[in-house]
Amino acid sequence: MRIVMALVIIVFSLISVSGCKSSAMVKVADEAAIVPTADSAVVVFVRPSPVGYAYQSVVYETTTEENQLVGIVSSGARVAYRTTPGTHMFMVVSEAADFLQATVEANKTYYVRVTPRIGVFRVRFSLDPVRAEEFKQPEFGFWGGLEWYENTDASRAWAKNNAASVQSKREEYFKKWSEKSAADKAEATLLPGDHR
């Protein structure tokens, strides 16, 4: 039984590393883009799970009326997003949409796990805040080996071409998110102290 479990873990690890990456994103050329500054915070969206590796998850900032593309987060990838200190709202889109609220501080790095779950016709995704205590877990060490990706003209074109569908999902699913209990919303909120 242990041998079977070890083989399953190895196979899923290989799938995670070699999973389908979006051709609309490129590896980060300058890692200065992922470092917070005295007047900015960095929110890292990471998708370590191999589940649903063939499907892409697209993350936006939806703090204002505009859907600002964060990036296409593939299985086994990390996308860093620089933003201002304060409270922000993020959305992940696939078959449906899910939201996460984040309050971030300058000169800090925060992590959000893009988590796949089974949908009706395809994989759906949720945004889960990574709490400060999770940085001590072995799983976080594995994330350090995941590649950094950033947007290209192709990813921005995809966002533009799919803007109507994305907005429709935002409107439909934000109503559902707004109706969640205070406890459920708290679980989907990244706190200022949750930085690395």
Identify the meaning behind each predicted range.
Residues C20-R196:
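Short loop/turn and low-complexity linker motifs enriched in small/turn-promoting residues
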Residues I15-G19:
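C-terminal motif of bacterial Sec signal peptides marking the signal peptidase cleavage site
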Residues M1-V8:
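Bacterial N-terminal signal peptides that target proteins for export
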